[in-house]
């Protein structure tokens, strides 16, 4: 409460002028209110919105952080003006958010939009952080790309600049591909095949207007988008082949904008 009052004072705004408070949390959220076990914060299942609203005397809405970021990007970011879109965040893991008619699709259990845990391989032997095998996150995240690279380098002795690096990063792979390294280009193609195929599967279900790609891996830029779009088009109906792919633009502010939009949507 003290922190909220301090922020209002800094902005020269009275509490009466505030429509509500939006919060993004790293975990499933039901009914814009109940957090269903937020492991990263050490929370069990409880009604965050009701608890906080009683303390501050304002309406409170809660959303999954990835979903909230997606809402922000569709409102004021790379997907500005889009009412039906999907955001994919490629970082240490793979996150996502689905926006339909301008609102978050959270699902019955609050787990909607967990794109990173779509199964994309039946032959994977290593386990994902979620405990399953063959998740998209194991291939399209920054750590997944590094894993694929190490496997590729161990498979043969093909000449590549990546071998000279003490610790390969996803950025190294994309930079090498841009510089003409054949092995790196093959790796980018593989990431594009897997991610493009996964997004194609999403498209045949919800037919979004666009996909917004964010997270650290998205800094690779057009070389990533080109690889993804190529394989996306191979997976979808002809009418969906012109679905837009854009880069996210809000960075860490996406969640802030999304939290505000949650409140405006409800009011």
Predicted features, each with a name:
Residues 65, 91, 259:
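Active-site glycine-centered loops adjacent to acidic/histidine catalytic or metal-binding residues
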Residues 95-99:
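Short beta-strand scaffold segments in enzyme catalytic cores
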Residues 35-42:
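Short glycine-enriched, charge-decorated loop/helix-capping segments at active-site entrances
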Residues 1-20, 29-34, 50-60, 72-82, ...:
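ATP-binding/phosphotransfer module of carbohydrate and carboxylate kinases, centering on a glycine-rich
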Residues 25, 31, 64, 100-101:
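A cytosolic small-molecule/anion-sensing beta-strand core signal
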Residues 85-88:
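Two-metal-ion RNase H-like nuclease active-site motif
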Residues 111-115:
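Structural signature of FAD isoalloxazine-binding scaffolds in flavoprotein oxidoreductases
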């Amino acid at each position: 409460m003290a922190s909220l009052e301090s922020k209002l004072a800094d902005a020269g705004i009275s509490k009466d002028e505030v429509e509500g408070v939006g919060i993004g949390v790293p975990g499933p959220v039901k009914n814009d209110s109940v957090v269903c076990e937020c492991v990263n914060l050490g929370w069990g299942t409880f009604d965050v919105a009701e608890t906080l609203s009683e303390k501050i005397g304002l309406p409170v809405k809660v959303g999954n952080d990835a979903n909230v970021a997606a809402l922000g990007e569709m409102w004021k970011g790379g997907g500005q003006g889009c009412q039906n879109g999907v955001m994919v965040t490629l970082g240490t893991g793979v996150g996502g958010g689905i926006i339909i008619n301008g609102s978050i699709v959270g699902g019955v259990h609050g787990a909607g939009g967990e794109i990173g845990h779509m199964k994309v391989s039946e032959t994977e032997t290593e386990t994902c952080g979620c405990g399953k095998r063959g998740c998209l996150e194991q291939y399209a995240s920054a750590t997944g790309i590094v894993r694929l690279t190490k496997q590729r380098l161990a498979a043969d002795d093909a000449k590549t600049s990546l071998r000279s690096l003490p610790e390969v990063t996803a950025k190294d792979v994309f930079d090498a591909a841009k510089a003409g390294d054949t092995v790196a280009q093959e790796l980018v193609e593989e990431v594009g095949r897997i991610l493009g195929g996964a997004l194609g599967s999403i498209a045949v279900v919800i037919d979004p207007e666009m996909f917004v790609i964010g997270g650290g891996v998205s800094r690779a830029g057009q070389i990533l988008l080109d690889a993804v779009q190529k394989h996306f088009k191979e997976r979808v109906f002809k009418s969906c082949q012109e679905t837009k792919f854009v880069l996210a633009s809000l960075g860490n502010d996406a969640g802030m904008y999304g939290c505000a939009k949650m409140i405006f949507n409800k009011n």
